[in-house]
Amino acid sequence: NGRQYVIAHSLKKMKQEDREIALNPQYFRAPGSREYVDISTLDESNRQVFQTIYYKEIPMDEQETLIVTYSPKYKAYQRAIRQSQIQRAQKILDSPGKKRRGKNPNDPARFIEKTAICKTGEVAKTYVYSLDEGRIAEEAQYDGFYAVVTNIDGNPEDIMKINQRRWEIEENFRIMKSEFEARPVYVRRED
C-alpha cells in the first residue's frame, strides 16, 4: 500500500527461535561501525560504552526488517525500576493480610509466588508466599533490549533515530488527549 512504518515489536512475544536470535549477544554493531560487537563482553563501566546504543538487523521477510537495539543505559534503567518493584513486592510479603496477584505487567505483586502446602495431595488451605525468582530472572534477560519492525529500506541508524523520537510523538498524543481543550463546534445548514 506504499506506507512506511517503524513500530515497536515485543521481544517477549516472539517465537522462541526468533527470540534466541534477537537476544544473542553476538552480531551487534555500534553506530558508524561496520565491525560486529559481542555485547556480553562490553565494559559497561566505560562512559562511552554506557551511552552507546548497539543494534543488529534481522530480516523478517522480503519486506520487513527487525532492528534489535541494546543500550547499557536502558539496561541500568530497567534494572533500577525492577529493583524498586521487587522491594515493593517484599513489602507486600512482609505486611500481614491478604496477598494479591499482580494483574498488570508493572504491578510489583507479579513477583510474588503463591505455593500451596499439602502433604496428602488434597486441596491445600495453607499457602506460602515468596518472591518468584524465576519470574525476576525471566524479566532480567530483556534488560537493555528494544526491538522495532520496519519496512523502510535504509540505514538502520536513521531508523533508530526515528524510533528515538517516538516518545516525543507519544507525548504529544497524550497532551492532545488529556490537556487540549476545545469548545463545541455547531454546524448549521442554510436549507
Question: Predicted segment positions?
Answer:
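Anion-binding and metal-coordination hotspots
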Residues: 1-191
